[in-house]
Structure formats: structure tokens, C-alpha cells
């Protein structure tokens, strides 16, 4: 039985990894060179259904394969994807199960998370305003990025207007999730909280790893911070789309597959059994 479950899990990881890679091909290009895609969304659904380690493998293998195909000459990009996507997928699956098992107050934490995104909005807006007088622009238009002074060097940036716009959308979404959480099922609240935390980690991780790996392997650190900042809008928009789709797609998918032995999950199954017993005793 155990060997069968492991075999089923390997097959499902392979299928979801292929879908994740395919989802990364569904993309909208951003002016700064990055793109919005559906790879993260597939990884999140896999993590919610299969668990943290499996979800991490799906993201790492699926989006890592895409990078191997198109960025084989950029080791920093491939390494960043393999590391970060595993971490993000693991966080989604682990937090989701922890929230359900421990009956965490998701509404309270959604308010707290909304506050964190509010800080991100404020900081990014300050950068945008302060950078408006910079005299050298790297990309132009609505997604313009400008040089400025950081650490005493001429490497300042005017953050894209996309960053504060989508940061405030994240803030509103998190707070609205807390306010209207009574309309969501317990699972939907758990999905919303776990995915928002993971996306926050993904945005921060994308910036830090791009800055460090690009600085170590490709260019200097001053140039790499400009490159890392220019990619933030794509990460934010992709994350926002992933959150919205995950909240509304997971529940019907879960109901369709929850009785299948291939998707058996000890923690979730035992939690549901305990809830049924509590209802019977009442």
C-alpha cells in the first residue's frame, strides 16, 4: 500500500510539473523584460493537494525545466528558480496543513498580512516619488525604472508604478479576505492565508536572489539591484493572479479528487474525520 501511494505521488508530481512548465509558457510580457505567467498557480494547486515537499518539487522541476530550455546560458536564473520555487511550494503546502490542523485564526493573520503589504505599498510609493527626478531612465513609460543613488553610488532606481499599484491591491485583498472571511469556507481561508504568505516570500526571494546571484555570477551588485528591481512588477502581478485563481479553483478541484486514494493526505483526512466526530457528538 505504501509503495502504491509513493508511486501515485511520483506520477502526480510528474503530471503537475509538466502542467507547471506548460503554464509558464502562458505569459504576458512586461516592458522591463519580465513576464506574467501561470506556472506559480499550477505549483500552488499541486502544493495544496499533494503537500509541501511535492508542491516544491512541482514548482522547482516545472519552472526549472522552462528555464533550462530558454535560459540554459544563464546559470543564475536556473539556480534561482530551482531554489526559490521549491521554497515557495513547500511553504504553501506546509502552512495550509498547519492552519487546518491547528485551527489557526486565518482572519486575524489576513489583517496582519494586509498591514505588511501596506508597508510594501508605502515604501514602494516613496521610492517611486523620490526617483521621479532621476535623470537617467532604463525603461520608459508606465513601467519606467530610473537610476539614482544607493549606498552612495549612482545606482538609484525609480520603482515601476506597477509596484505601488499592485501592492495596494494586495493590501486590499488581504484585508477584504479578513473582513469577508465568514463567507469563505475554512479551506478557502486557509488557502488564502497560506498562498498570500508564500507569494510574499516569492516576491522578496525573487528580488534578493536576483540581486545576489546576478551580482555574483553575471554583473556587479550595483547593476544587479537595478535588474532585480525592474523584475518586481512581473512577480507582483503573477502573485496576485495566482492568489485569486487559487482561492476559487482549489475548492472544486479538492471536492472532485478528495476521495481518490492517489490524493490521500493523512493530516487533512484526520482533521476532517475529527470534525465529523465532533458534529456527531454535538
Pin down the residues of each PLM region:
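Loop-helix junctions at membrane interfaces
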Residues: 1-282
